[in-house]
Amino acid sequence: MTKGILLGDKFPDFRAETNEGFIPSFYDWIGKDSWAILFSHPRDFTPVCTTELARLVQLAPEFKKRNVKLIGLSCDSAESHRKWVDDIMAVCKMKCNDGDTCCSGNKLPFPIIADENRFLATELGMMDPDERDENGNALTARCVFIIGPEKTLKLSILYPATTGRNFDEILRVVDSLQLTAVKLVATPVDWKGGDDCVVLPTIDDTEAKKLFGEKINTIELPSGKHYLRMVAHPK
């Protein structure tokens, strides 16, 4: 493994200890056809991290519907992760709507890696140089890696410790990535599942008509260039 990973790179396989036990192979844990999201947080028992993971618990059923497996990571111990679960679930229950079952029980719907020696976090470029523990050791940033079924990196996001992530946005991005992995379209600004898409600029008009028929809405622009071509969400 090298320090840091770029879009399109093969994501490394690794072994890891988690709050749910030892994972001998990250690839085997993901499986052959699933997507995966590896997300790091700076530290257990901290306010922003607790609210983030509570939201992920709420959204876990939505990720599962999309065949996405979730796994967390920080430099805390597996035992610390296990003790933290009750706090996460308590915050989750505070934010649950009536009838929600995602926050019931006292078990997270995803494991959290205990990267105490900071090996994975360092090699994957997850460290935040501005955040340190009481001993001066660097802590992980709020990183998100989305990994496709072929085990390549599809998206990476790196937030500082002071800024919590919007996991509804991560869910939206998954919808876009999964759609554009199988359809020759791109998703425009603020797109949500079911919204119109745009034809890829690499596809000429003749090929676009073969793919999408006559239902292409070409937007007239001052430049006279016909690159903004809208199509309905592909089935």
UniProtKB/Swiss-Prot annotation:
Catalysed conversion reaction: a hydroperoxide + [protein]-dithiol = [protein]-disulfide + an alcohol + H2O
Localisation: Cytoplasm
InterPro entries documented for this protein: AhpC/TSA, Peroxiredoxin_AhpC-typ, Peroxiredoxin_C, PRX_1cys, Thioredoxin-like_sf, Thioredoxin_domain
GO terms of biological process kind: cell redox homeostasis
GO cellular component terms, semicolon-separated: cytosol; mitochondrion
Enzyme class, UniProt record, top EC level: oxidoreductase
PROSITE patterns, alphabetized: THIOREDOXIN_2 (PS51352)
GO molecular function: peroxiredoxin activity
Annotated active site: 49
Domain Thioredoxin per the UniProt entry, residue ranges: 5-179
EC number(s) from the headed UniProt entry: 1.11.1.-
Principal subcellular localisation of the protein: cytoplasm
Keywords: Antioxidant, Cytoplasm, Oxidoreductase, Peroxidase, Redox-active center
Keyword Oxidoreductase: yes
Function: Thiol-specific peroxidase that catalyzes the reduction of hydrogen peroxide and organic hydroperoxides to water and alcohols, respectively. Plays a role in cell protection against oxidative stress by detoxifying peroxides.
Family: Belongs to the peroxiredoxin family. Prx6 subfamily.
Additional notes on this entry: The active site is a conserved redox-active cysteine residue, the peroxidatic cysteine (C(P)), which makes the nucleophilic attack on the peroxide substrate. The peroxide oxidizes the C(P)-SH to cysteine sulfenic acid (C(P)-SOH), which then reacts with another cysteine residue, the resolving cysteine (C(R)), to form a disulfide bridge. The disulfide is subsequently reduced by an appropriate electron donor to complete the catalytic cycle. In this 1-Cys peroxiredoxin, no C(R) is present and C(P) instead forms a disulfide with a cysteine from another protein or with a small thiol molecule.
Protein name: 1-Cys peroxiredoxin
Gene source species: Dirofilaria immitis (Canine heartworm)
Lineage: Eukaryota, Metazoa, Ecdysozoa, Nematoda, Chromadorea
